[in-house]
């Protein structure tokens, strides 16, 4: 019953009346003092200027994490790994309404909802044009809808990152503008393992994964390693100063 209730909430939340821009602005203003301090510290720890020009979120279904990258005018810089507390389904794209799969692809954030049942939420443009095209070829009239990145630690087909972390992401996207944020969702980290497509997958999944792999190439693991080393040094220095 709990799973059914969560699934219904994930479907129905976007069907409710969304906040007008004034409500969104009011929420951003309310969040601003805490989020400016938190994000400034987070970006400084990564050695990245704040605020950034653009951001990219990379959701890894296996391992359940959400990477935040920022563009500094020359290249993408890694900022932080956020945990994904809940993401139902398994490897493979979303195919139909109610399959409880998190989609796979490149998406944009198209709505901010400060009145979400999941604290705050950001709606993705799933299904995008590619998703619709594959559904049409296969005769799938309802490929699904209403996919969000949201707060709370429970979800059914969306990405739940917890209330604290969704505040950071919601504020950052609101501050920069939704057109300055992309979301890449992959089944696992193609930078670490060879791409493998399940034998029962539609033929187009291999093409999709090849495309996503090309996009991931702009976000090298070496950049993450460098940030980790920087952060560890900074943390050790802070402890040393405190002593």
Residue ranges and their predicted role:
Residues 75-78:
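Tryptophan-centered short beta-strand motifs
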Residues 12-14:
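N-terminal signal peptide c-region/cleavage motif recognized by signal peptidases
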Residues 6-7, 17:
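Cleavable N-terminal signal peptides
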């Amino acid at each position: 019953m709990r799973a059914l209730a969560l699934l219904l909430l994930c479907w129905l939340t976007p069907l409710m009346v969304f906040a007008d821009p004034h409500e969104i602005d009011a929420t951003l203003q309310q969040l601003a003092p805490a989020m400016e301090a938190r994000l400034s510290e987070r970006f400084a720890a990564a050695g990245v200027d704040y605020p950034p020009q653009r951001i990219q979120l990379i959701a890894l279904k296996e391992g359940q994490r959400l990477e935040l990258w920022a563009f500094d005018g020359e290249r993408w810089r890694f900022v932080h790994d956020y945990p994904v507390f809940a993401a139902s389904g398994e490897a493979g794209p979303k195919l139909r309404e109610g399959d409880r799969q998190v989609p796979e692809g490149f998406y944009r954030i198209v709505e901010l909802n400060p009145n979400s049942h999941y604290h705050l939420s950001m709606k993705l443009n799933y299904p995008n044009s590619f998703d619709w095209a594959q559904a049409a070829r296969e005769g799938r009239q309802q490929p699904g809808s209403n996919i969000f990145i949201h707060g709370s630690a429970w979800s059914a087909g969306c990405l739940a990152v917890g209330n604290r972390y969704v505040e950071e992401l919601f504020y950052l996207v609101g501050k920069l503008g939704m057109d300055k944020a992309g979301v890449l969702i992959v089944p696992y980290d193609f930078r670490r393992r060879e791409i493998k497509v399940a034998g029962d997958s539609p033929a187009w999944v291999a093409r999709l994964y090849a495309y996503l792999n090309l996009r991931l190439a702009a976000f090298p693991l070496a950049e993450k390693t460098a940030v980790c080393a920087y952060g560890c040094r900074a943390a050790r220095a802070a402890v040393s100063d405190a002593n």
